[in-house]
């Protein structure tokens, strides 16, 4: 049984409850104040997954009078999720995401008349808005025509929601791989710069200075020995 949880005919679940359940894989991405903390690709992944969850959950709704408020609230959460998806697609330069979002907008526009009958308006940018008075009074049978398991709108939306989520997942994986490569490159560069070997020892480059200095010291000691013993006072020593 789904998380819509038919807790009882007297239990009312808010649209925020449904929105959180749709964004269960990343609930902060479903919160307006938190969305700015994520990259565009992370939002695309979260929105795609949430939309997939929405089109799975909505068809399981009861669409009965005792679930009246819950049904409408779940659709309100769907509207927010759908709009979030369009937002993340619009801020992305990825053509696959753009195509999937465009297909979803085209599908939704085909049902503009049915949506209008339950108080949902399609705006010029493709986003959805509910008109409170009609949305709250429209017959539930009209909601069922759009959002039940047999509804073509849900079935078609599910296909492109899956594509959108899959592309978002691929983009995030690619971003993570690039980040890991940069970290590895930075770590390798740091080790090369400070001369650290794998054993942790630090090697100093030998430019011949150490050898020359040792030779000079050795020759100086020999010179001191000769002078102190009085032998070879007129000897010329070439260093």
Can you describe what each PLM-predicted range is?
Residues 1-239:
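Polar, low-complexity export/assembly segments characteristic of proteins
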